[in-house]
Amino acid sequence: MKYRHKLTILLVVTSLAPMTVLALYSHSRQSTMVRSSELEDMQSIMEQTKEGIDSQTAVYASLLNYLTYSPDIEEIIKEKNIDNYTAYEKYTEIADPLLSVPKSYHDAINRIQLFADSIQVEHEYTLVPLDKMQEEWWSEGLKDDVRIQWKVDRTRGEVVAVRMIYAQQKLNAVLCISLDYDKIFQPLTNILTDENGGIVADQDGNVLYNKTGLKELKLFDDNEKDTSQTADKLLSKISQTCTWTQTESEENDWVFYFYKSQDAISGSVRRILLEEIPLIIACGFIILFLGLSFSRIFTRKIEELTKNMDQVNHGSREVTVSSD
């Protein structure tokens, strides 16, 4: 092998070695940045989605508070000994507009109900005797608390906001707003694709919402129902193949989880690598070209001297010598 070729190989190898190290380090850093950016994007999306749902629940919470302190509602709750005609007149002229009109302005409202000890006869769906509250699915597990309590039933597709009204430490009435499940969680449904999924749970870990577009993600065994798993169990399965983030509601005790397939995140990293490959190949060709050029320059005089010596060995007495 000629000296020039050896020198070319030496120059190319010594140039490629640091370039390879630099390329690997750069790719590693970019991969880390991409993964971090993906996680930040997920958190940002989840925060915006949570704010969208919170803004809805805040509206209905404000409506519930308004109705709770409405003088007309207070009058209906306090007046217990009135004749049926007067009661019917108050119900139709006062209570019905208060409890029915908001439904025409908010398409997520299914109904607004007042359960009161003063109501003796049920009036349509708006005014109901207090003892009939126990027949409602959401009455189970209610706390003795004047703050708004949120209940979700995924099977019925219903979300309710309940407020207890007390008089002298005795339950006097209950106001309840029933909301459409799909409309309340629509902001979360809108961000879901075939690469991610979302979960909403309460502070006890009960799953209130669970949807995923990942077909290969199996969250339940064949003998398990969707409602039988807690949020922690679901997350332990999700963590095996996905990256997830969480945020808490500011309006109630809901916790929002948003997860994305690790393959989808790795796909972003692979796209960066594919973008880097042409640059790496171009750098390789440049190094090869420079190696050939420099080795030719460095060995030109040596090759001329070798040629002259070869001529002398063959009996030539004419030698060309040039000096720089």
Each predicted region: which residue ranges?
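Cytoplasm-proximal transmembrane signaling helix
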Residues: Y257, Q262-R317, V321-S322
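Extracytoplasmic/periplasmic sensory segments of membrane signal-transduction proteins
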Residues: E40-E140
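Soluble sensory domains of the PAS superfamily and closely related sensory modules
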Residues: E135-R147, D221-I238
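Extreme N-terminal signal-anchor transmembrane helix of membrane signaling/transducer proteins, especially
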Residues: M1-S36, E40
